[in-house]
Amino acid sequence: MALSFLELMELRVVKALVDRDVTLQHVRRAAQVAAERFNTKHPLASRRVFTDGRHIFSAVTDAAEAPDVVKWTAAEIDQVVAGPVFDQFLSEIEFDSATSLASRWWPLGRQVPVILDPAIRFGAPVVAGTGVRTSTLARLARTTSVRDVAVAYELELAQAHAAINFEQQLSTA
């Protein structure tokens, strides 16, 4: 079974919530309400609906700078909290300005040059700005030095290391 990029983003949110004891029933209910409220098939992949890992929230406004957000609790859906709390979570994801849906993900944060973008290599993890798959670099690094891999693909050594480390983390997960 293949997942779309948006489904992957939604599963990331669901996993984070379930790992912190939020019930699937609550996640499902919140997703259904958000899908209707924001007219989207992928509410948990939307900039307007996001999580801090324990709760589900939705943006009250589309303001770019620290919008107020609505916290969705099991008992009540409209509890406003401050937007800046979620800067770290939202900073890992780039959202499409037209749809407000996730369009690019930095799975280790923006400081690490590894991205998933459905428009690049069908969403496979790549070195940002290059389109070079992290899996290709990791595979080559098993038989040659990281420096040689970086030179072969015209990457900085730090980019090659980041890609290889990312793949190693995937293999141990």
Mark where each language-model region is:
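Long, charge-rich, low-complexity intrinsically disordered regions
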Residues: 2, 10-13, 18-143, 147-151, ...
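Conserved AdoMet
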Residues: 5
